[in-house]
Structure formats: structure tokens, C-alpha cells
Amino acid sequence: EAALLDRCGEDQFLLKNEIDKLAALSGYGTITAEMVAQLGTVTLDADTFDMVKLVAAGRTDQAQQKLKTLLALQNEPIMITGALIGNYIDMYRVLQAKRSRRSLADVAKDFGYGGKWSYRLGETERTASRFKRRQLEKCLEVLQKLDADLKSSKLDADLLMQKALCELALAGRS
């Protein structure tokens, strides 16, 4: 259940379609996590969070590959960047809350996270634990610059995105 929500979000129409598709694949038996991972539709937010986790784990090559896939699927670079920014802001919020001895429930309430926030913020907390506050601030600066460059530069957006992923990897290690 959590894997499907993680990949599809809370869109009831999308969830119903995914469950129908996966149920047919399983012969109307048990739907496994492997089936969800292999064939489940993914939202941009889920894909970009996967990219963040890959970068945080030092697997930049795989993050670059996921970026190439997102771009090949005609996702707009500015939308990918916005989703990345959202994911890094989530990590910053969770990290600051932890430093202030506040719970994930407090974060969810304070920032209006709805639905299955406990799973989402729990995953965010695990990823954020690899960072110090200054590293996340540097990552947000990298993404702010990327956003500005995508909106104003004549340079190739794909190259700007690839460069930013490398800079995020470096910022997360400094």
C-alpha cells in the first residue's frame, strides 16, 4: 500500500487505475511491491524524491539516469526543478523540526501536509538525516540558481539540470 501511494500520490483516479492494472497483472491475486516498482505509474514528485535519495546516497550516476528518463518523458525542466526544490524544502523542514525537538506530526500540521504524511515525512526524515543544515541550505542555493538559469539563460536546459545534480552531490558532501 505504501509503495503504491509513494509512487502515485493520493490521486484517487490514478490509484484506482493502478490497482486495476496491477490486479490484472497479478491474476487478481496478491500485488507485490516488485510489481508496483516495475509497472506502477510514478508521479513527478515521487521520481524527483528518488533522485534526491540517489544523490544523498552518492549515486549521482543513477540520479542522472533518472533525470534523463524524466526529460525523455517530456517533463518540463522547470517542473522537475520545482519538484526538487519542494523535496529539499521538505528535508530542511524535517531537519529543523528534529533539531527543535518537534515531531513529524507537528511538521505535517504546521505546513499543511495532508493524506499519508507520516509515510512521506518518515522517508524524508531518513534522507534528511544524511545532511547538516548548512548542506541543505547550499543545496537550496544550487536549486535557486538552477531555477533562475532555466528562466533566463539561453543554455541548454538538460545541461543545466545535469550540472545542478552534480552540484547537489558536491553540496551534500561538503
Predicted regions and their residues:
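Helix-rich C-terminal "collar"/helical-bundle subdomain used as an assembly and partner-interaction module
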Residues: 59-174
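Long, charge-dense, solvent-exposed interaction surfaces that engage phosphate-rich ligands
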Residues: 1-49, 54-57
